Amino acid sequence: PLLRDQGNSAYVRDTGRLHGGMLEWGFYEDKNPRLVDPEDIGNPEKTMGSDSMRYLDLEEVAEPLEKAFETTPILNELGWDEKSSFNGLLSVTPDAGSLIGESPEVRGFWLCEAVWVKDGPGCARLCAESMVLGKTQVDMHAFDIARFYPEQKEKEFVKSRVYENSQTVYTPAVHPREPYISEREKFVSPFYKREKELGGHFDNEVARWERALAYESNRDKLEEYLADIPVRGNEWDRRHVPYELANAEHLAMSDSVGMINLSHFPIMDIEGPDAE
């Protein structure tokens, strides 16, 4: 059995051992998560038993543990077991997704990383399908290890985004289109200033590029096309994306003409047999 305390970013579970079991309490560090560089993961001075288990001081979890005593008083009765307490490493990516597939750098080297317990069976199946069949039953883009552009693998970018994702990895609930705060306005089009003047909606970036989803300057087109635009009644569905405005722009362009900024789209050179 597992008890989650989302407000405290913590959980309690019975490990189910023989002779009465054992309670285990865990906490996800959300306010100021500590990042570990890959080069430091196997540091013998900081690890215990496994490279993913690092030494833990009681002071590091004192505040959330105190709150846990209130919700589950038996923890206070059992006390602190220093020998079996540790800091566990979590694998977090710049977009909080898993990494599944064949390494782009090493042919034949397959990975299934940054996978949480609840996602384990599904991710394992996707990896197996990729290896055996060469394709999967579902779209793999959000998990594909090759989805990141070189600029998204720069160390400072990775650390900034991982730090941001780690703060919301357990609580609170995060909108699927929640905009990132760190590492913004790094890649902009030659028209970015003008797009801002036109009221461009730049809530989300794509592959580090700032891309407008719609423009406030086109709001007058809403009145003309409102009857043809689907209504999204729930605020959650409309959050971070100006759907009505974007739909009006598309309809207006279908009836007339328009200009689309494609400067941030990738240009790829295809080489090899039949590349023409």
Feature-to-residue mapping (PLM):
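C-terminal catalytic lobe of FAD-dependent flavoproteins
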Residues: 7, 35-38, 47, 51-175, ...
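Glycine/proline-enriched, intrinsically flexible loops and inter-domain linkers
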Residues: 139, 149-276
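Structured core elements
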Residues: 11, 24, 99, 110-111, ...
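Active-site neighborhoods of metal-dependent hydrolases
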Residues: 27, 43-44
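Mid-domain catalytic core of redox enzymes
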Residues: 1-23, 27-34, 56-59
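Surface-exposed intrinsically disordered loops and tails
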Residues: 1, 44-46
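A short local loop/turn or secondary-structure capping micro-motif enriched for an aromatic residue
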Residues: 25, 32-35, 118-120, 220-222
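A broadly conserved detector of short glycine/acidic/proline-rich loop/turn motifs that flank catalytic sites
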Residues: 7, 16, 29-30, 104, ...
